[in-house]
């Protein structure tokens, strides 16, 4: 819900929604298009069995299914922020005071950093994964492995942001 709220407040996204769907309403927005809450099929669209059926139809049309994976960040209200906060870049109250656009208090009170590209402002609907965390890498690998079971290929969006030298910035 937090990422959805941020998406609904974003004027650029609201304009894009209106251009694509002139009669859209806030209820049509499932979440932020930039912030992954879960790598599961949205229940509004079906379930994993429906995804398999869709993939079979795509194959019958002579094409393959490519799914997206984002190793750099997740939705700011992703369940891991509560169950595995050590998988994210953390801060403290002083960090929020110094850089309020970079840090936020997550559910449960942990202070976490928003996702970002080091050359641009933080994305305020996301949380930054700590790619140096062994637990984060293991959890991401499991998500990627599971996604790959349903796809003919996986596109890794923002993959350059998890390179050691880029991430260190």
Predicted feature locations:
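Active-site and adjacent substrate-binding regions of carbohydrate-active enzymes
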Residues: 1-169
């Amino acid at each position: 819900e937090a990422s959805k709220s941020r998406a609904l407040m974003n004027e650029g996204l609201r304009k894009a929604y209106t251009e694509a769907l002139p009669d859209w309403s806030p209820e049509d927005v499932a979440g932020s298009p930039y912030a992954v809450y879960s790598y599961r099929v949205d229940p509004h669209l079906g379930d994993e069995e429906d995804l398999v059926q869709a993939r079979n139809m795509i194959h019958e049309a002579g094409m393959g299914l490519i799914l997206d994976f984002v190793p750099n960040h997740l939705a700011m209200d992703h369940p891991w922020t509560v169950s595995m906060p050590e998988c994210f870049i953390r801060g403290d109250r002083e960090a929020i005071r110094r850089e309020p656009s970079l840090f936020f208090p997550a559910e449960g009170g942990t202070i976490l950093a928003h996702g970002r590209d080091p050359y641009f402002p933080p994305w305020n609907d996301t949380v930054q994964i700590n790619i140096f965390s062994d637990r984060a890498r293991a959890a991401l690998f499991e998500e990627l492995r599971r996604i790959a079971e349903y796809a003919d290929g996986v596109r890794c969006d923002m993959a350059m942001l998890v390179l050691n030298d880029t991430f260190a910035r």
